[in-house]
Regions:
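PLP-dependent enzyme catalytic core of the Aspartate aminotransferase-like
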Residues: 81-131
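A common structural junction motif
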Residues: 65-75, 126-131
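Positively charged, small/polar-rich N-terminal and surface patches that mediate targeting and assembly
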Residues: 23, 75-86
Length: 131
């Protein structure tokens, strides 16, 4: 888990600075609304990084990734990506997702054990291809 968390923090920091990302959600980022609580309860931020991509590009972005596999569930040593609005939160419906602040542009990453620089390079290449 240490390597998952280390990689996830680096990916979250990268995404939080990217101009094509509207919002990055990761409990170890200082701007996370529950950062202080997470710091007290957790030694690390976990392996899941969520972000909202600018524009209507979630599927285009996901389809251009090479290292990440598209999946509707997480729990692997390999990096995975999912689209919450059409997988985990599909049954809630559009209005329910709006109330829960789960936009269609939201993407969730499960960060694996691959080299973190390779993961960031894959993400960056996907951004460059679609936007």
């Amino acid at each position: 888990m240490d390597q998952h968390c280390h990689n996830a923090l680096k990916v979250a920091n990268y995404l939080s600075q990217h101009p094509k990302v509207e919002k990055t959600i990761y409990p170890s980022l200082a701007d996370h609304p529950q950062h202080a609580l997470a710091s007290k309860q957790m030694s690390q931020g976990g392996s899941i990084v969520t972000f909202v991509i600018k524009g209507n590009n979630a599927f285009k972005f996901m389809n251009k990734l090479n290292i990440f596999d598209i999946s509707n569930n997480f729990g692997d040593t390999k990096s995975l990506v999912t689209h919450p609005a059409t997988t985990t939160h599909r049954v809630i419906g559009e209005e329910g997702r709006k109330k829960l602040n789960i936009p269609d542009a939201m993407i969730r990453l499960s960060i694996g054990l691959e080299d973190v620089d390779d993961l960031i390079e894959d993400i960056d290449a996907s951004f460059k291809q679609i936007l």
